[in-house]
Amino acid sequence: MKNQAHPIVVVKRRRHKPHGGGAHGSWKIAYADFMTAMMAFFLVMWLISISSPKELIQIAEYFRTPLATAVTGGNRIANSESPIPGGGDDYTQQQGEVEKQPNIDELKKRMEQSRLNKLRGDLDQLIESDPKLRALRPHLKIDLVQEGLRIQIIDSQNRPMFKTGSAEVEPYMRDILRAIAPVLNGIPNRISLAGHTDDFPYANGEKGYSNWELSADRANASRRELVAGGLDNGKVLRVVGMAATMRLSDRGPDDAINRRISLLVLNKQAEQAILHENAESQNEPVSVLQQPAAAPPASVPTSPKAEPR
């Protein structure tokens, strides 16, 4: 018995390969997270779609509120009526809406001012690019005034813009007017034309024909040249003759610089003022301003004979 050999027991330990189910289960977690996020997203979108503008403002106000104020329930900004603690400005109040609302009229004025400034730049560029107009630059005065953009074509002793004592346009005046016409036609603003003369009495022509008629005829002749250059005839709102009533120079009423054509690109306010002068309401006409007594017709000077302009 003692010599009997004990049986040898061999234990084989097999390594169990992991099944694929454990690795494949991770996508379920990611998918569940994705579905949760999508559900939250669509829930937020649905809440936004059914909320009123007032509720949306209050929600936005809540998220702008400092955390400490929201938690402690401190004083709310501007004593808002928002039901959310710590709310900010109450945009639902009428007074607040008036303060926050932009001034539409002021924005329109700024846009119009910007358009007129651009027009001024375009005209300067046009003059510099054309040798003929560049040579006539001393006869052009462009500036911004309260009524809009003013373009003045000024006469000179050596180079008049019109025939002496006549409304016949000189060739270089025609070049200026026809060159700027397309530029003026490219903006919505309307135009006022005014003719000016010096203080010399008009000596030629029919009796009663004075600097008033001459300045008006020259302004109308300028209008015709603008239309011939491509300007829409409907853009001209007014053509007037001012005679020698508005001097441009302090050097004297007979200075050649006072003989000019003033072309005014009107802003909206100036245009409405001109239209209001001749407008009529449905019930009664607009009150007419009292006109001064008519001056006697200008007599033809006898001695010495005045120089025609």
Swiss-Prot record:
CDD domains: OmpA_C-like
Keyword set includes Oxidoreductase: no
Periplasmic-side positions: 51-309
Main location: membrane
Subcellular location: Cell inner membrane
Residue ranges, compositional bias (Low complexity): 300-309
Family annotation (Pfam families): MotB_plug, OmpA
Cytoplasmic compartment spans: 1-28
Membrane-spanning parts: 29-50
Membrane topology category: Single-pass type II membrane protein
One Gene Ontology term, aspect cellular component: bacterial-type flagellum stator complex
InterPro entries: Bact_OuterMem_StrucFunc (IPR050330), MotB-like_N_dom (IPR025713), OmpA-like (IPR006665), OmpA-like_sf (IPR036737)
This protein's UniProt keywords: Cell inner membrane, Cell membrane, Chemotaxis, Flagellar rotation, Membrane, Transmembrane, Transmembrane helix
Domain called OmpA-like: residue spans: 149-269
Main function: MotA and MotB comprise the stator element of the flagellar motor complex. Required for the rotation of the flagellar motor. Might be a linker that fastens the torque-generating machinery to the cell wall.
PANTHER family on file: MOTILITY PROTEIN B (PTHR30329:SF18), STATOR ELEMENT OF FLAGELLAR MOTOR COMPLEX (PTHR30329)
Protein name (database record): Motility protein B
